[in-house]
């Protein structure tokens, strides 16, 4: 294969790689509660992790600041793709694709499957009160979730170019959703079973929008005399007023089987409105036995139905095989080098140009259900100090995650409690903490992190992709 052809091929592969990344990034634009507060005494929002948990006082939240949760998680960190290198005597920050970063260094922090996620929740308004034989809450909140999965082969292709024989990046996918939520919760003691308390919540969701992007198949086989590339991708956008923009691709070598075609070049948003609705349930129980407190909850068991959905796709699997092209260095022939290279470019363009498949009537998806299991132990000789162990597992298809968290919780005085904890799970090791100031009547302030910030880049961006903040102001009465 001649040098000009190899150069052209490398450029095409680079375009494919960048296009694949661009498809995932827009979607990257369910830990919506702080797990550090699960065992924390007098934590106002424990019932959101287990609906059986109640409060000692009635309360009303400060609008929009009653329970603010911002969380970023990932196994792919900024320090894995950005490096400091001395270039021409000057220290510069460069991407992993820079020639001054070796392949070994670039791939050191890249896993076979790299996860990125953000989970944000704002409690717009919340209130809790004692009535009907138990404790009741009503919450109005806004929720936004983003998940992305990037295979290690995606980064290897971007770094190495075409040095390996095969690349498989089929696990490249992203999901984003936003919705409003109204939740009603009730919990009570079961008098017939001393120590047992149960609770349940019903939730109504109003969908703002959702986007799913995924490569069902993306393969590149590099033989000595033949290359084969295959792609199969879909994007589903459930956003009111959204339509895809299209452009017409004009082949460099038009002819039978290679006619002009329309492809998705972007999107337009005309107006704003609700895009779906859903319903969910929380179920929970806790049982106190001697110095132990056992708890179990299933949170967000339900569905979300999204309305009209715009679908863009490769329309099945697309394949390009280079041995179908015969190159002739005689410029006067139909299969001259330039003509065949143009035809090859046309075919490679079809691999990543998506077709507007029109509108689907609707999509129904299950909510990301979380199962929380915990056990707490109070020291017999100093009951103000308790230790807790919990497991949380979020069931969300390819974005499923789990974590174990061990915590020490102390409440030295009536108006103050605190916790420090360590966690390990899908997203690695974390250290969490929370401080909780609470009077029986008047004022409650809490602040904490499930994932404590580590080192920051010069721009103030965390080098580790795990970070969170939980903050709230409420008024007990």
Which residues fall in each region the model found?
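Bacterial Sec-dependent N-terminal signal peptides
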Residues: 1-35, 477
């Amino acid at each position: 294969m001649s040098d000009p052809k190899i150069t052209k091929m490398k450029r095409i592969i680079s375009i494919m790689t960048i296009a694949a990344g661009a498809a995932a990034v827009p979607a990257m634009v369910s830990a919506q509660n702080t797990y550090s507060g699960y065992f924390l005494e007098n934590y106002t929002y424990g019932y959101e992790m287990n609906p059986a948990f109640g409060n000692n006082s009635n309360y009303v939240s400060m609008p929009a600041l009653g329970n603010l949760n911002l969380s970023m998680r990932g196994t792919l960190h900024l320090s894995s793709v950005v490096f400091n290198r001395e270039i021409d005597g000057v220290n510069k920050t460069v991407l992993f694709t820079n020639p001054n970063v070796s392949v070994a260094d670039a791939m050191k922090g890249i896993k076979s499957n790299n996860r990125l996620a953000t989970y944000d929740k704002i409690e717009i308004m919340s209130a809790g009160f004692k009535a009907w034989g138990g404790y009741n809450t009503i919450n109005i909140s806004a929720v936004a979730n983003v998940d992305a999965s990037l295979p290690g082969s995606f980064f290897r292709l971007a770094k190495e170019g075409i040095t390996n024989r095969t690349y498989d990046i089929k696990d490249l996918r992203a999901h984003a959703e936003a919705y409003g939520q109204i939740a009603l919760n009730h919990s009570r003691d079961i008098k017939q079973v001393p120590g047992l308390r149960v609770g349940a919540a019903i939730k109504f969701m109003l969908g703002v929008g959702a986007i799913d992007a995924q490569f069902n198949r993306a393969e590149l086989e590099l033989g000595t005399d033949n290359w084969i590339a295959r792609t199969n991708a879909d994007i589903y956008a459930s956003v009111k007023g959204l339509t895809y923009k299209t452009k017409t691709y004009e082949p460099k070598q038009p002819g039978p089987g290679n006619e002009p075609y329309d492809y998705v070049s972007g999107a337009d948003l005309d107006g704003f409105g609700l895009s779906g609705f859903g319903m969910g349930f929380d179920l929970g129980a806790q049982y106190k036995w001697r110095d132990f407190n056992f708890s179990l909850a299933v949170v967000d068991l339900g569905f979300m139905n999204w309305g009209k959905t715009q679908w863009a796709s490769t329309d099945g699997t697309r394949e390009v095989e280079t041995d179908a092209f015969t190159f002739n260095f005689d410029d006067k022939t139909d299969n001259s080098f330039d003509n065949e290279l143009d035809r090859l470019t046309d075919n490679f363009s079809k691999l990543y140009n998506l077709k507007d498949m029109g509108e689907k009537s609707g999509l129904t998806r299950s909510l990301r259900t979380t199962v929380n299991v915990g056990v707490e132990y109070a020291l017999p000789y100093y009951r103000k100090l308790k230790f807790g162990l919990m497991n949380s597992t979020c069931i969300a298809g390819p974005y499923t995650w789990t974590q174990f968290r061990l915590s020490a919780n102390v409440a030295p005085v009536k108006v103050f409690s605190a916790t420090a904890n360590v966690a390990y799970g899908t997203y690695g090791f974390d250290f969490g903490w929370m401080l909780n100031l609470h009077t029986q009547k008047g004022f409650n302030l809490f602040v904490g992190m499930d994932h404590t910030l580590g080192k920051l880049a010069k721009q103030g961006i965390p080098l580790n992709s795990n970070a969170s903040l939980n903050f709230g102001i409420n008024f007990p009465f």
